[in-house]
Amino acid sequence: MKLTKAQYDEIAQFLGHVQPTRQSLRKLKEKFPSQSQSTLLSIFSQEYQKQIKRTHAKHHTAEAVETYYQRYLNGVMKNAAAPVLLELANEMDFAPSLMARIVLERFLQEQEQAIPSKTLINSMLRDPSQIPDGVLANQIYQCTVNDCCYGPLVDCIKHFINNRSCSLCVAEDQLRAKGYDKTPDFILEVPVAVEGHIIHWIESKASFGDESSHQAYLQDQFWSYWNRFGPGLVIYWYGFIEELDCHRERGILLKDCFPTDIVTLRHSMAQR
């Protein structure tokens, strides 16, 4: 779904006055009922992530980590069935999955008398049954399933969307095997025309295309692809600000779905 910049700014302004909780997400949907729920969720997630980046450091000081861990221990001692970690994350205005990671890492340090590897932590976050403490495992699980912006569940959904197949394409991993460093998700073996524009590559983004993220992608990825492979198509599956689709004549198109009016140039030339 495409939004005007004015529509996007209105949504972002609303999000600036609410806490990043599921209750706030419901309020967002009620406030903007005509907008796609998936688009609203993506904008909600991105605005939340901007906030998390600004406050991330303060949650990882030694003092903060110890405070969170002791509050977790005291909380489950009083009531092990209560969503202690989830409520702590909401109180601290911090992502539940990230709070879960902090407490899990502190727990493992205490158990193993050493700093646990990221691989081990990630594995336990994906599958809490590996955690050697049933109460903590349940607390971690509650955080994971109630986090709509971070965590393994969100990563899994994004991975699925970004890997939608294209029968005319050479996939990113194949390109990297050939020695390319920065590569789009797909290179078209046969160029196609979309809305009158020639396309050589497709980049898939499981997010909403707002101004800050799109400008970063242009600088870090899209213009590099354009220089190496020619004109291409970017699909923002959750929509984008329509004013950002301003580089078509230079060779970068934006869409919010896979185009249905593709003309394969090889087929078109054979008909002549």
Curated annotation (Swiss-Prot):
Physiological role: May play a role in erythroid cell differentiation.
InterPro entries: CDIN1
Lineage: Eukaryota, Metazoa, Chordata, Craniata, Vertebrata
Protein location: Nucleus; Cytoplasm
GO cellular component: cytoplasm; nucleus
Keywords, alphabetical: Cytoplasm, Nucleus
PANTHER family per UniProt: CDAN1-INTERACTING NUCLEASE 1, SIMILAR TO CDNA SEQUENCE BC052040
Gene giving rise to this polypeptide: CDIN1
Primary location class: nucleus
Source organism, top-level taxon: Eukaryota
GO biological process, one term: erythrocyte differentiation
Pfam families: TPD (PF14811)
Protein name per the record: CDAN1-interacting nuclease 1
